Structure formats: structure tokens, C-alpha cells
């Protein structure tokens, strides 16, 4: 099956690839699933609440679809493997509804925001590994109350997984900009759209990785990193994208948790298209672009800083271009696969909505501005920092949007199991 590209973007720096599947290949859409980290918050003050133990009491974590994370102020949801945007969206909403139902039983709510707008002390989940991380990494672990969004996409083998990692590494910063949802940090405006990215990149292995070239090389690098003694175990391989240790998947880890469930499902569709495009490029003999890792770090920093507000570094030449142009260039690059999978129009509509509305960081800032104007009869000093009350309003708004569209009965479907994420 041949999928014709749509041609070059306006500067001709990157084209939608012309990809050819082997004519005898059996093909079906890759399954995908996601993990979302959510804040547990006070619905009045907006402050994080250390209630994860209470929310998870009596639940079988491996099968419930809810689990602990590093901090007691957060809870993680996991979807089942899915085949379509609609199926995944239903699962994401279900996970959010389950978490929120558990939180409501203790007078709390969950909010899909990637950092806490309000300052508070954090509490590490009682667990020997987490205790060792706290002792080893100090303030990095102490302050690590951040909520990310991880997308797992099925691959045929670890070898294919490494090919995917090498091909997608230069495009991941665009996802950071689209999902950026953390403009505040411990009571302060940061000037960043995704400050979670900055906080997360303090870990020793975090951020973009180099081109590996083979599974042997990937495993050699992981082995060398472990031999340094700096990190505790393979679970601390925090590359922007990695081969999952537990599932037959590639795991992409650059995104903030998305405020809206629809945006989360949309980002997962983009990731799946990246994975499929990478695999087809391999079959066509297309080599990964050897962009220096230093440039990828710069692109990640820029996406984290300005989000969709200004320029991003274009993934063709890594020069600054308007963010919307770079986002549409990514859609254009992925369009053959998206079209083949019947998702192109869905993605175009979803991306248009995000660009028109703004990412989560923009929505958080706008909520704070609206609150201040209401409290001061429309008279506010430009650039004045938001009050704690305004930040509480940000959290309250986020908590409402987080569960918008969630099913009334969050326990109807079978329990999520990401271990089943694979091609049928």
C-alpha cells in the first residue's frame, strides 16, 4: 500500500514522506494507551492534598487502573490498550472519573495540571525505592510534584522500538509545546508554559537522547548509565522516549498532563502516527536525521518556555518559526499515516481547536486574569502576580474541566491493563 505525501512545507525543509508498505504485509493499526498523573487538590483552597493512600485504600493497584506515584499529592491513571481515538478518549475519561470519585469521598478533587500553582509541602509515598530516591537526590525528589502524560504505542520488537526512538527524537518538542500546562510553580508565575519540563530535566538521565543505531547500542548505553552508580535502577532511565521495561511498547514522555481529556487523546494519536511513520521510514530505507542532542535540548527548552505563544525551533532546520507553522508542519509530515488510518480530519480539527484556544498554560493564565478582574472591578495592574485566591480559582477551573464528559459510572468497563498493549 502506498501513501502519497502532501509535498513540502513552505520552506521545503521537510516533506511528508512517501511511504510504501510491503505488499504482502499483514497490517493493522497499532494499539496505544496512556498514563496520566493527576493532582489531588482541595476544591476550595486549591492546595495539593496528600491523600493518595486514602484514595487507593482497598484497591488492587495492578488491575484497578489507579496507582501511586512519587508523591502522595498525586495519583496515576492507566488506560487499557486501545485502537481508536474514541476508544482511548472513553478510557481517559473513565480513569479521571474513577480518580475523582475516590477523591470526592475524602472531600477532594483531582486536577489535570502539571504542577501545583500554589505553594505547599509535599509528602513522598511510603515506599523503600522512593525513600532511597529522596535520600539520594535531595531537593530534586523533594520538589518533584509534577504530573506528566506518557503515551505507550505498540511495537513488534525492541529492535523496531529503537528504530522508532531514533526517528522521532527531533519532533518531540512540538508535543511539549502543544501540551504545556504548568505556568505556575509553588505559588509563582514562572514565565514558562511547561515548567514541569524544567523541573523534570533536573534528573540525571532526563531529556533528549542521541541516535542509538541498534538495540545493542541502546542496551549498552543503559548498561553504562547503570554502571555509573548515579541512578538507582533502569526505572530511572528518563529519556524523552524509551523502550518500556514492562510492555511491548515505545513510551513517549515529553508531555504535560493535558487539561482536557480530548487533547490527551489527540496527542496520543499524534504519537501513534509518529511511531508508525518511523517504522515505515525504516522499511523504505530512510535513515534518522542525526540532529545534535544539544539542538534537541534547545528545542525542548524553547517549547517549554514559550509553548504556542511565540516561536518554536522547526524540526527541519532547527531555526525559529511561528509555533503554529511548526505544529502544522508536523501534521503535514504525519498526514500520510493519519490519512491512511482515517484520523487526518480528526487531527486537523483538534489541532485547530488547540491553536485557537491555546494550550493548558494559556488557559490557566487566562483564568487567573479573569478572577483578578472580577475581584477588582476590571482594574488590575498589568504584570501583577496572581494572588493565592486567583491561583485557587485556576485549580478550581482545572478540576471542573478535568472530568468534563466523564462517564457517570466509572466502574462499568474492565480494569485497564497496559500489559496488553500490543498489535493484535
Swiss-Prot record:
Its EC number is 6.3.2.2. Signal peptide: none annotated. The keyword Signal does not apply. GO terms for biological process: modified amino acid biosynthetic process. Residues 1-20, 405-424 are annotated as: Disordered. It catalyses: L-cysteine + L-glutamate + ATP = gamma-L-glutamyl-L-cysteine + ADP + phosphate + H(+). One of its GO terms (molecular function) is ATP binding. Keywords: ATP-binding, Ligase, Nucleotide-binding. InterPro entries: GCL_type2/YbdK_subfam, GCS2, Gln_synth/guanido_kin_cat_dom, YbdK. The keyword Acyltransferase does not apply. HAMAP family: Glu_cys_ligase_2. NCBIfam families: gshA_cyan_rel, PRK13517.1-1. Belongs to the glutamate--cysteine ligase type 2 family. YbdK subfamily. ATP-dependent carboxylate-amine ligase which exhibits weak glutamate--cysteine ligase activity. This is Putative glutamate--cysteine ligase 2-3. It comes from Paenarthrobacter aurescens (strain TC1).
